[in-house]
């Protein structure tokens, strides 16, 4: 990484893969509007069509189910605002782009202390009325990495005649995602979480389901999203999707081993550290833990001074550091939630990066112990 930074914040954004940079650079040298009928326009359209197939393949969807957007936030907004539903249910641990896109009168599905969505509560909430309902449950939480029982949630939703939207932004490229097996009606993706460029994402929409455009204009994306397509970003998204899909089996094994080494090392250095979701199915790259008595911002800043990049909770709040709402929803004590950090690995993480982190962690723990002893 530039400047010898040890980057362990992949859940915030992943470094661009070199192959993605090359693919995008090649396209940036070309010109042509995909809506034009001449040669350059047809070439641009061909690139988009090929990219649509590659992105769909990553999650087992069909190419004509892919709607390109400016990212996960826009895709989530399109799903929650574009689907006709008199009622919206969202899980309490959803990304802010889901929680804030939902209507003001939406209902919140509670989460168990384990970090898993309360399916019994969801079932009961759906049974309260027979009005058209949209349910939104993410596949993997961005802070804890805990994987949610989306297929079960979809079965419950469909049994009540409801639709299910699933945000897989954090999961894609880090675990296998099968659109059909999940049973979701809509799926949100974002390229920059697995080595693609920022500013490009997609909403997968089941064939036959109507979604009203929230971006009016020239009728691109089959009328779902107006505006000239960002062909370079779409090409980068596609290349990242192909690379992620090909590398996934080995990457999952490698990331799990590195994460386990990280957590074992942290426990050895600071036995009083508290891990969240360690007894649940998690993303293989994500570790969320707290050092009691030491604010998350202090930990993050000290690690930053040591040249290591990690996060205090989610990284989508304009640089603000606040107590984790996800952990609070799980019933975690306020002080402990305020001491939680997230370490997330990715395609370029090496064993040496974990050892660098643990060396810095030992130094930070030593300073904390000295202050407490004094």
Protein language model annotation of sequence segments:
Residues 1-374:
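Pyridoxal 5′-phosphate
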């Amino acid at each position: 990484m530039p400047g010898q930074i040890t980057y362990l914040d992949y859940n915030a954004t992943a470094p661009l893969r070199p192959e993605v940079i090359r693919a995008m650079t090649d396209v940036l040298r070309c010109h042509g509007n995909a809506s034009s009928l001449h040669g350059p326009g047809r070439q641009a359209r061909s690139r988009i069509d090929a990219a649509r197939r590659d992105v769909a393949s990553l999650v087992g969807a069909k190419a004509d189910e892919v709607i390109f957007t400016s990212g996960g936030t826009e895709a989530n907004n399109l799903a929650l605002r574009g689907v006709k539903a008199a009622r919206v249910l969202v899980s309490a641990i959803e990304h802010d782009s889901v929680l804030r896109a939902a209507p003001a009168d939406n209902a919140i599905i509670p989460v168990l202390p384990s970090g898993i969505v309360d399916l019994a509560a969801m079932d009961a909430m759906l049974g309260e009325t027979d009005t058209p309902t949209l349910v939104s449950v993410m596949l993997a939480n961005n802070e804890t990495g805990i994987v949610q029982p989306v297929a079960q949630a979809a079965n419950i939703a469909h049994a009540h005649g409801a639709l299910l939207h699933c945000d897989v932004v954090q999961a894609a490229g880090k675990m296998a995602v099968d659109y059909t097996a999940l049973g979701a009606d809509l799926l949100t993706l974002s390229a920059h979480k697995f080595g693609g460029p920022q500013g490009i994402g997609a909403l997968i929409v089941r064939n036959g389901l109507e979604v009203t455009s929230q971006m009016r204009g020239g009728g691109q994306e089959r009328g779902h999203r107006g505006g000239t397509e960002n062909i370079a970003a779409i090409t980068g998204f596609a290349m990242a999707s192909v690379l992620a899909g090909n590398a996934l089996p080995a990457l999952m094994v490698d990331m799990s081993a590195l994460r386990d080494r990280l957590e074992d090392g942290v426990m050895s250095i600071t036995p009083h550290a508290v891990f969240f979701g360690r007894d649940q199915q998690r993303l293989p790259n994500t570790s969320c833990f707290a050092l009691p008595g030491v604010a998350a911002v202090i930990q993050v800043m000290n690690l930053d001074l040591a040249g290591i990049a990690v996060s205090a909770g989610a990284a989508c709040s304009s640089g603000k550091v606040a107590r984790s709402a996800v952990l609070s929803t799980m019933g975690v004590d306020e002080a402990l939630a305020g001491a939680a950090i997230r370490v997330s690995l990715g395609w370029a993480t090496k064993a040496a990066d974990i050892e660098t982190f643990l060396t810095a962690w030992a130094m930070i723990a030593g300073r904390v112990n000295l202050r407490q002893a004094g």
